[in-house]
Every structure is written in C-alpha cells, then in structure tokens.
Swiss-Prot record:
Protein name according to UniProt: Fructose-1,6-bisphosphatase class 1
Originating organism: Bordetella petrii (strain ATCC BAA-461 / DSM 12804 / CCUG 43448)
Oligomeric and partner information: Homotetramer.
GO molecular function: fructose 1,6-bisphosphate 1-phosphatase activity; magnesium ion binding
CDD domains, per database record: FBPase (cd00354)
Family: Belongs to the FBPase class 1 family.
Major enzyme class: hydrolase
Length: 342
C-alpha cells in the first residue's frame, strides 16, 4: 500500500474543490518541519542539554523551561522568512512578532504554544506544540503594519489548526476545516505519513480528564457532573467512568481524539477574577476547532469556545471539550444553575 505524505495530502486538498490556498499549504509544511526539529530536540533530552528551567519567566508569569525557549525560537526562525505570514504570536512572548522588513509578507497570521505541557519535560511525559492560522486583514496587503488587534478574531475564523504530540511516536494532527487527519513522523525517512484519516470523537464516553485535586474550587455544575461520573452504574449517568489526567493538554486531547472522552479545565474559585487557566488564542481555539471538526464539542461552560470574541492576546478561558453528548450535558448543568433561584 502506497503511503501518502503530508505534502501529497495538502497538494490534493489544494487541487480539490476545497481550494486550500497555496500560501496556507506552504505555511503548514513549514510549521510541520519546525515540529520535526522540536521533536528531535525533545527526544535528545538530557543528552542534548535541553532539560531544566531558566531564570526567566514568560508573559504568563511561568518559569520558562529551556525547551520552551528553544521551541519558540525554532518556530519563529522557520516561519519568518517564507513570505506566507504577516506576523506571529506566541504564548511565550508578550507582544506579537512582526515579520522583519528584509522578508516578504504574506496574508496570514500564525499563533502557537511552542511547547504545551512543558512542566512534564523533565519527567519524560508526552508534550506537544499547538498552532492556529488566521487571515491577516486586507489592509496588510497594502504594506500597513500588523497590530495586536488584528489577531483578536474569534476561533470560528481560523483557517487551519493543529498540534504535534511528542510521545512514543511523534504525530501531527491537522484540520483545514474539512475534517481531521493525523500524520506520524517516519524518523528514518524524515517525512510525515498519513496514518489516521477522518479522525472522529465518539459522541459518548466513559472517560473524563480533570485535575481532581482542585474539586473543592470548582463551580457547582462541574462538581455535579464529576460527582455523577464517580457514582458509576448506580448514579444518574448509569455507567462506570475512568479518570485520566496527564497534565499536558496535547496528550489529554490526543487521547480523546483517538478513543473519546471529555477534557475539563474549568473556572477555579482560587482566582475568581480569571475566566480560566488555559489561553484562548494559543490552546483553546485551535483545540476546539480540531475537536469540532472531529464531531465533538467545546465550550467554556456556557458558550461555544469558537464564538468567543477575544479582547486581549493572552486571554484565558475555561475549557470543556470532547465527546459531544458529555460536553452538552455539562453545558446544560451550567444553564440550569444560572436559572436556579438565588
């Protein structure tokens, strides 16, 4: 059986009625090459001198790992010269990264979390890269400078989204708005090979992923749902659930993409002024597009995540995504709680 590479898949999409633009095709290929370089650095671990933390913090106030910084640099350097982008934004940087004047500018914006789950680097747990592609405003074609406001588009306007997961195998999961496909890195040949066509998330599940140690801080609708999961066959849901929690969004979502489940990183009463912990633009939006394209659902509790209009680049949000029926159940519990008398 002849194997289909990422390049072949993208060329086929470009030639089809879906009319994937050539700039998007080339952009995705560049991002995929950068992910190969990151995968190589991750796999070397201590042998490559990339483990451990730096003394610096990122814009989120989190201590940066060496691989965080290296991965960010790899993505910036790989993408700034190709002529596909007008600008980039990274979870690791406070402001946007403009394309240097010495390079041509393109019609798209790239956002990424260069190394999601980096707290797991030193303990050798699966981590990954998440990315999102948006259209740049038309005025950019007239050589006008891109600004942060240009990135503040709802997730429904994403052109493409994907993630690479660095585990026992390195995989790239991608959507261009026509379903979800998965590619596995052939390390000997150095190519991405299509191994998962038409990836789908089952509508029902018996698995949930959440950090149970924070249960006392959750909103009542989330506690209600988890209590019902824990009640098993004798409870209102009528089935036994298993809990899975890797503390790496890429790894947790990838498991859901391959076998179903619900991932929850809800609002937390310890920081009531924050809508959530995960970043809307770098994590929630791309993952929500992937999940929805695979037949799942993604909400913040009350709203579809892809409908949220961002008001700042590093905006945070509560995230509940995965198997459609389970996500909708949690949404109903939030709606019922909002309608209940005080």
């Amino acid at each position: 059986m002849k194997r289909k590479t990422l390049t072949q898949y993208l060329v086929e999409q470009q030639r089809s009625a879906n009319a994937l633009g050539p700039e998007v095709r080339l952009l995705i290929e560049v991002v995929a090459r950068a992910c190969k370089a990151i995968s190589h650095a991750v796999s070397k671990g201590a042998l490559g001198g990339v483990l451990g933390s730096l003394e610096s913090e990122n814009v989120q106030g989190e201590v940066q790992k060496k691989l965080d910084v290296l991965s960010n640099e790899i993505l910036l350097e790989a993408n700034e010269w190709g002529g596909h982008l007008a600008a980039m934004a990274s979870e690791e940087m406070e402001t946007i990264h403009l394309i240097p004047n010495r390079y041509p500018k393109g019609e798209y914006l790239l956002l990424f979390d260069p190394l999601d789950g980096s707290s797991n680097i030193d303990v050798n747990v699966s981590i990954g890269t998440i990315f999102s592609v948006l259209h740049a405003p038309h005025r950019v074609a007239g050589a006008e400078e891109v600004c942060e406001q240009d990135f503040l588009q709802p997730g429904s306007q994403q052109v493409a989204a994907g993630y690479a997961v660095y585990g026992p195998q390195t995989m790239l999961v991608l959507t261009i708005g026509t379903g979800v496909v998965g590619f596995t890195l052939d390390r000997e040949m150095g190519s991405w090979v299509l191994t998962h066509e038409n990836m789908r998330v089952p509508e029902d599940t018996k698995e949930f992923a959440i950090n149970m140690s924070n249960m006392r801080h959750w909103a009542p609708p989330v506690r209600r749902y988890i209590d019902e999961c824990l009640a098993g066959t004798t409870g209102p849901l009528g089935k036994d659930y298993n809990m899975r929690w890797i503390a790496s969004m890429v790894a947790d979502v990838h498991r859901i993409m391959t076998r179903g489940g619900i991932f929850m990183y809800p609002w937390d009463a310890r920081e009531p002024g924050k809508a959530g912990k995960l970043r809307l633009m770098y994590e929630a939006n791309p993952m929500s597009m992937i999940i929805e394209q695979a037949g799942g659902a993604a909400i913040d509790g009350t709203r579809r995540i892809l409908d949220i209009q961002p008001d700042k680049l590093h905006q945070r949000v509560s995230v509940i995504l995965g198997s459609k029926n389970e996500v909708e159940r949690v949404g109903r519990y939030h709606a019922e709680a909002a309608q209940a008398p005080a």
